[in-house]
Design a protein with these regions (language model features):
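Paired acidic/hydrophobic, glycine-rich loop segments that form the ligand-binding mouth/hinge
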Residues: 80-83, 205-206, 223-228, 243
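A ligand-binding cleft/hinge motif common to bilobed small-molecule-binding domains
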Residues: 89-91, 218, 223-241
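Extracytoplasmic ligand-binding site segments that recognize negatively charged/polar headgroups
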Residues: 33-42, 77-79, 83-216
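A bilobed periplasmic-binding-protein/Venus flytrap-type ligand-binding module shared by bacterial periplasmic
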Residues: 131-138, 174-179, 253-267, 272, ...
Length: 346
């Protein structure tokens, strides 16, 4: 009996050893804003990273940082990596919702300007630009090319839509009022509000989401509207007879972080590093039209030239724009939003 049991025990141990790697395969849960954007990001970035690292990928979506707060407050978060706008990152980091970044692991972050990374967050994957767009049917000889043109309804008559939020709109108002790009911050709040208050009578629709802005474009309800570049590029690709300019665009960074108490922190840290890899970020342009954030992405040679020139982070386009200052907004968002809401009720 003893002689029979020993070989059997050895066989069981061997099977267990073979099974262990599969059972122990690391898992990482990555969270973004969902929709078509996250679907594209998953194919271009998340899935290739998971394959490269040999980890099991899970995904979820969020709406606001309140969702992250609930994860942390539960005491047993299920999320690991979250991707956000940089303003949301600053707010969440201030609340202590993120793990400290181990920069000895996230070495790709060194490629980015220091103002885009912090102790608890790193740069994200893409930039998004708030740009001026117009109907080519209304303006057959070229539409408004600056925020001054947007606010000038005599020079460029036509139905205007405007974003019902202070972020982006205050910057646009100051640029329209003659403030130089490098002097936009700190925002002269009184001056910006005065410009917008005088403009209110000329606005046909105050939209509340960028999806609504695209609906207005497709329905032909307006002739001039500021919107995110990815939205208008997609609308044009689907047949909208519109055009846009990156001139004086307001370009906003994204960021990524690890949720406080993340169940797979070590794996998440490696995943975070790969998200900043320029070659992997270049792959995003095969699926979506927002410009990758890595400063080295265009040097990879992996982005088709005809695609590169249409992206907001392409050097010639980037230098035409104003980089939104998330630190100013983190310090001023609440009082400015209150003032905006009061103005819209006047």
């Amino acid at each position: 009996m003893r002689k029979t049991m020993l070989p059997l025990a050895a066989a069981l141990l061997a099977c267990a050893a073979l099974a262990t790697p599969g059972l122990a395969q690391p898992t990482v849960t990555v969270v973004d804003y969902g929709g078509t954007w996250q679907a594209a990001e998953s194919k271009a970035l998340f899935q290739p990273i998971a394959k490269k690292l040999g980890v099991t990928l899970r995904e979820d979506s969020l709406q606001t940082i309140a969702d992250i707060r609930l994860q942390v407050q539960s005491g047993k978060p299920t999320w690991d990596v979250v991707a956000l706008g940089i303003g949301e990152c600053l707010a969440a980091a201030k609340e202590g919702l993120f793990e400290p970044v181990d920069y000895s692991v996230v070495t790709n972050a060194a490629d980015f300007p220091p103002e885009l990374r912090g102790p608890n967050y790193v740069p994200g994957t893409v930039w998004a630009s708030f740009v001026l767009t117009w109907s080519k049917e209304k303006f057959k000889n070229g539409g408004p090319q600056s925020w001054a043109d947007y606010f000038d309804t005599k020079k460029f008559p036509g139905a205007r839509a405007a974003y019902n939020a202070p972020r982006f709109m205050l910057e646009a108002a100051l640029l329209a009022d003659g403030v130089a790009k490098d002097k936009v911050y700190p925002i002269d709040i009184d001056r910006a509000f005065a410009k917008i208050r005088a403009f209110r009578k000329d606005v046909a629709v105050w939209y509340t989401s960028f999806g609504q802005a695209v609906d207005l474009i497709n329905a032909g309800e307006v002739d001039v509207v500021p919107v995110l570049d990815g939205r208008i590029i997609d609308a044009i690709a689907k047949g909208a007879k519109w055009d846009f300019t990156f001139n004086q665009g307001i370009i906003n960074a994204a960021c990524s972080a690890i949720v406080k108490g993340a169940p797979n922190k070590a794996t998440a840290m490696k995943f975070l590093n790969e998200m900043l890899d320029p070659e992997l970020q270049a792959n995003l342009t095969n699926y979506f039209v927002y410009g990758p954030m890595s400063p080295k992405v265009y040097a990879t040679g992996l982005i088709k030239p005809e695609v590169a020139v249409k992206l907001n982070s392409y050097p010639a386009n980037f230098k035409m724009q104003v980089v939104l200052d998330p630190h100013w907004w983190a310090d001023n968002r609440v009082p400015v939003q209150s003032r905006w809401d009061a103005m819209m009720k006047e």
